[in-house]
Amino acid sequence: MFSIINPSDDFWTKDKYIMLTIKGPMEWEAEIPGISTDFFCKFSNVSVPHFRDMHSPGAPDIKWITACTKMIDVILNYWNNKTAVPTPAKWYAQAENKAGRPSLILLIALDGIPSATIGKHTTEIRGVLIKDFFDGNAPKIDDWCTYAKTKKNGGGTQVFSLSYIPFALLQIIRPQFQWAWTNINELGDVCDEIHRKHIISHFNKKPNVKLMLFPKDGINGISLKSKFLGTIEWLSDLGIVTEDAWIRRDIRSYMQLLTLTHGDVLIHRALSIAKKRIRATRKAIDFIAHIDTDFQIYENPVYQLFCLQSFDPILAGTILYQWLSHRGGKKNTVSFIGPPGCGKSMLTGAILENIPLHGILHGSLNTKNLRAYGQVLVLWWKDISINFDNFNIIKSLLGGQKIIFPINENDHVQIGPCPIIATSCVDIRSMVHSNLHKINLSQRVYNFTFDKVIPRNFPVIQKDDINQFLFWARNRSINCFIDYTVPKIL
């Protein structure tokens, strides 16, 4: 984020702006019938700096840049005559190419003009432009002068805060060649900063004069589509699947999308696609066991918990690491069995904190508590209850197979394959009576029995403690051919 901008600062939010978009002609004579051959002669006194990258492919041509300077004056003259305030309205204008067509974006402060009347004023602005700029010749371009609305088709007038400009328009998420003019001096400070960061290649600033900025050439530019796809990849790599997690990690990228038209829709779409990408390409272990800081394993609460419960920490860590890596074969489930207060839920909760897509299943397997957990990276089966009616489905789920659970005649839910954590106060095998069923469970579960209640001063296990413990254990892996019960140290 720009260091000089606080998006909650009153300066960046108090003023409200409307946005006009004017489409320019790709061929002047064809799309503005009747225009005279000496149309541009009246612009001969307009001073426009020349830079080498102005003539790069995709940059707005000099005709359009020159035309924009005049159109801005025409619109502002109309606007300031309509407002009831003594000072000229604040404004920001940006010229660029969109899909090969030149365009002008103009944000104007709403001082003295109700937003409900913008439609009427836009119609009048079209007429003024045709009369005073196009010499009475109406452009033959669909929707050539429009204002931003809250909906794509219809809706009310969309208003913007000043922060929309630095977060959305000055960022390289729009077409890469942009010219801009403004009478808002504070935006000059923003331009100074992004110029130092080499986002723009040319920048002129004069006191009390329009500002002009010329973004860097296409080598460093990136389209909105590419930026959006890159954002999805970034979300997937970091396991970000909620808006809160996104804001905590990088509010700048969140704000860049939010300030665009229909930004909330783009944010939800990006998170939805990121979730699907994570489900299809990642494992739970991909989000765990990544530590780049020094630590003492003997001070780690997970290590201390397994020692307290008389387990070998290396063996326990090896089992958990292989289980999360889908390397346990049929053994797709770890169960933590013990009385309340033994630490099983605290340990499980810390594991799940590291994994972006997880589900919690309570009690017995039924349609009500399955629908929400179609495809997750880890499933916590809390207070697991096993009944004979669904045993084949339960066996497949605990064994790491994909199951399709019928909801009704026309609907179903798919679960797995994903690692399972089962917690209970009683041994899972005691829930079935058939020896065959007990054998099936033994083949699919690593069972940890926690028989000691942790002391009151025992440290709370955090998500980073899980990371440290598994990072330590992965390089100390040992053979763990265990039938069902994880052995304890005498």
Curated annotation (Swiss-Prot):
Gene Ontology CC: host cell nucleus
Molecular-function annotations in GO: DNA binding; nucleotide binding
InterPro entries with a match to the protein in the record: NS1-Nuc, P-loop_NTPase, Parvovirus_NS1_helicase, PV_NS1-NUC
UniProt key word Nucleotide-binding: yes
Cystines in this chain: none
The keyword Nucleotide-binding is annotated on this UniProt entry: yes
Keywords from the UniProt entry: DNA replication, DNA-binding, Host nucleus, Nucleotide-binding
UniProt name for this protein: Protein U94
Origin organism lineage: Viruses, Duplodnaviria, Heunggongvirae, Peploviricota, Herviviricetes
The gene coding this protein: U94
